[in-house]
Amino acid sequence: MPRRTDIKSILIIGAGPIVIGQACEFDYSGTQACKALKEEGFRVILVNSNPATIMTDPELADATYIEPITPEVVAKIIAKERPDALLPTMGGQTALNTALSLRRMGVLDRYNVEMIGADATAIDKAEDRALFREAMSKIGLETPKSMLANATDVKNADRKTHEAERAALKAEKPDNLDAELDALETRWNLGEGDRKQRYISHAMAIAAQALDHVGLPAIIRPSFTMGGTGGGIAYNRAEFYDIVQSGLDASPTTEVLIEESVLGWKEYEMEVVRDKADNCIIVCSIENIDPMGVHTGDSITVAPALTLTDKEYQMMRNASIAVLREIGVETGGSNVQFAVNPADGRLVVIEMNPRVSRSSALASKATGFPIAKIAAKLAVGYTLDELENDITGGATPASFEPSIDYVVTKIPRFAFEKFPGAEPVLTTAMKSVGEVMAIGRTFQESLQKALRGLETGLTGLDEIEIPGLGHGATVANHADDRNAIRAALGTPTPDRLRMVAQAIRMGTSLEDVHAMCKIDPWFLEQIAGILAMEARIREHGIPQDAVNLRMLKAMGFSDARLASLTRTDAEVVTKIREKLDVHPVYKRIDTCAAEFASPTAYMYSTYEVPFAGALANEAQVSSRKKVVILGGGPNRIGQGIEFDYCCCHAAFALRDAGYEAIMINCNPETVSTDYDTSDRLYFDPLTAEDVLEILRAEQASGELLGVIVQFGGQTPLKLADALEKAGIPILGTSPDMIDLAEDRDRFQKLLHKLGLSQPKNGIAYSVEQARLVAGELGFPLVVRPSYVLGGRAMQIIHDESMLQSYLLDTVPGLVPEDIKQKYPNDKTGQINTLLGKNPLLFDTYLSGAIEVDVDCLCDGKATFVSGILEHIEEAGIHSGDSACSLPVHSLPSELVDELERQTAALARALNVGGLMNVQYAIKDGTVYVLEVNPRASRTVPFVAKTIGRPIAKIAARIMAGETLEDAFAHYGAMPDPRNPGHIAVKEAVFPFARFPGVDILLGPEMRSTGEVMGLDRDFALAFAKSQLGAGVDLPRSGTLFVSVRDEDKKGILPAVKRLAGLGFKVLATSGTQRFLAENGVVAEKINKVLEGRPHIEDAIRNRQVQIVFNTTDGQKAVSDSKSLRRATLMQKVPYYTTLSGAAAVAEAIAALKAGSLEVRPLQEYFA
């Protein structure tokens, strides 16, 4: 079946901003889909609100819409572009839900758009819990005992009533029929919140019946959500009703499945691809080391599945294919999840995703099989046997089922430290923000590689303190000790695997460990094997012969771990290893277990002696001139997709320039680890040892021009010293200049020399010094550790008690394991040792200042300021969390001139080669330099999409030796970023709903996971789009609540008057209400939470408030208003905590009321 010729244009819906449960794996799949369909000659139309994606690069689609992904906005794009088909399977749950909404709205039928990849019936059958359960029963597959709680009958009755009202109105035929129909629709839409509450109440009554049927503990799974949003495990009735309420609220269909507990069962996933001719292949089997009860995105997983018998595997394989056939996924990839009772082998189907997923990306990277690319081609009519497998160079067709001869381990990365008050317990609702993948010839090797690739300071299965046991406890002799171990192993946490290892070290039997944690005994035996070898190393030291040292390395032991076990330095171990000529060899990911030769250079390291006739090193290093790009490792808050975008652009530009581009990274979600992004990909941890070994192999042939460390965030920068010591050339800005920008003393001298201002500041190398510096500067002040990204542990300190708490509670969380072991019982000693290496930096807090980000390109002489971004929030909120606009929207031109002058002076002084970011604060007309980052920043993709020039590509060419002018010439003339002819607004997206109990108030530590971009000719509309893209539904009418501190009352007045003038009712607390009344605004008084009921929180929970303006002052006021902020979050009420934010949203609402949003492709802005 050749590709279809009856469709010419295809709309792809992206996944939108990076959120927990839906991250950059969908940029990877969407990018593959765009390339695959363009390759086939289709006109590709893309909508995605996330500017940090490769898929939104204008060359990847014919029309690229960076617009909010809402059904209404996508409907406008369909009306404008008239696509023949819609591919909804590449953009996660966002794309599926949007596609289903478009179908329900009649948009697809109206414009004759066909859904391809998975039709609406298949999506409904897979995502609707009732339909899925019926489908599984029909084909003889068991699902856990369950019951649905929904309000389908009530919804249907409401819909019929609404349709009857429309029909009656049409029958009356009034003169103003269209206006009357619009008014009816407006009333219907405004009543959505009230209807939702009725539906939830109705479903809660059914849930009570379900509880009697299913019993406790119970699993709650909301329909049509991602990453387990709103779901969880209930162990008692109170938890049950709380989670059901949350799940019903999260589900767009107000439906949850209440399921019997299968906690402790083994969990497996199958990645399946099916074509129209019913050819089916299993791309990969995945086994979760964590048993059922932990979301698969939060579980440590391995591929292939390691503890299945062949008979069990074949049963699961056949069941997976039967599921796809019954659901009706005809063209593309799907993920099917199973649970197996280890006691009796009972197999149940948990769920399936009728689309590419997080697991699809992992399976693609684990096997080399490009699931998203193949799925896109199947969607347009091809069959698997007609498509070539790129990895084998076409030696095998895509219908050839992948086979692998290695083990892959994925470990998630968490960010609980960013959310004080959040309990670090894992459930069926996903909480991880990133993941690392490692490849080894054995499970032990891949596990230890993954642990060190996490970049959390681990060198392997490092020791850990079990809560409830004394520090350094080595034996569990007492009942209390055993109870502490049981509690630690029985509670799923990010550190549970290390707790398991520690319990085994302390003499707990494997049988007891299994009983406590339910992890399969085979995995426990493998961990015990590592620990037994650790004990031998402690006793006998580092082997002095190559055979035994190679054996240790083949088990995954890093030089740093061996050094820790023998109480020496990693450099000592490395010297012994090099003296014995023990080095890794590099193997290829080839999809066929070496059955066919693979031309694709997708490599991983391992330690083994090659068998007779085999290549010792399959890397096949070329003789070309080459550049190595270090990636960013696992995603985390503060270092995410924006840096991967920069690494990809560097690879693209260098390949275009004739260099061989070599990528090193260990993140399976990203485009940078796609097999065709670079000339050669090394999927290995970003540690000094692993990177230097790769460079050693690459230097065996050809010329290594250098290594790029400034695109991957803080991760590669930390390796700069080791690279320099090894004599490896670093391209672009020198490590010394990068260090100068981080070193407060040196940086201060540079600013003084240049005549630039900075806030009054100080530096502390000890606890005592910190107190002295704070005393000299006075409060409030900003404190942060040096050499961190994302504002890690950065705080605004208001008084002495806050400083004391920061030093004794927050700083110890930064202390690495080696320092803790050196000072086991001396917290002050630990802190002082840490600060000796990474001092604390103190700045006077510039209250009310405007913060500005400036990005620039420099070749050491010439400078181009590519963007000046004005923050909408005032200084004090981390730049990554603040909304900002490009170009500036309120700064006078003379201040912009001064910012450009200071930026150019800094770039020249630091001899920047490539990119530089400067953060400024402007107060009372004075420009203060806050910090300088002579590297890529997270604003690079946003700036590039706004000005229409790929600044990361230009920077890469500069690093390779081109001048700024020559590098720019490849991509068009230098634009004027001050007057691009349009306005772009970047807005941050937060995961607060995932962390109950956490305060949503923003500060200097970054907490957003992603971003969106609003693009328009008008600032108000661009801001409105940014809010819609971030999931904030701006009200067109309703009630505004205002409560602001005294110094903000005058400033808030214009925004309140604007909304009151648009017909909004105003509620206010007593002081604010008096002020508003004195200034001509009618406002109704309402109680604060502490003033008695009914109070403002009651009004918000009763959906009587549609938007909130609230500013606070001082710790007590912040604390007192926390419950108010949580209420707005849970009720999805827009909440603005700054004067500038309030002013911007008031203008945005006015613009929306004045007319509808227009949509334009990126290409139209730069035509």
Swiss-Prot record:
It is an enzyme of class 6 (ligase). Residues 456-619 are annotated as: Oligomerization domain. One of its GO terms (cellular component) is cytoplasm. Its cofactor is Mg(2+); Mn(2+). This is Carbamoyl phosphate synthase large chain. The gene is carB. GO terms for biological process: 'de novo' UMP biosynthetic process; glutamine metabolic process; L-arginine biosynthetic process; regulation of DNA-templated transcription. Belongs to the CarB family. It catalyses: hydrogencarbonate + L-glutamine + 2 ATP + H2O = carbamoyl phosphate + L-glutamate + 2 ADP + phosphate + 2 H(+). Mn(2+) 4 binds at E931, N933. The keyword Heme does not apply. Pathway: Amino-acid biosynthesis; L-arginine biosynthesis; carbamoyl phosphate from bicarbonate: step 1/1; Pyrimidine metabolism; UMP biosynthesis via de novo pathway; (S)-dihydroorotate from bicarbonate: step 1/3. Residues 184-380, 748-960 form the ATP-grasp domain. ATP 2 binds at R784, T844, L846, E851, G876, I877, H878, S879, Q919, E931. ATP 1 binds at R129, R221, G227, G228, E260, V262, E267, G293, V294, H295, Q337, E351. Mg(2+) 2 binds at E351, N353.
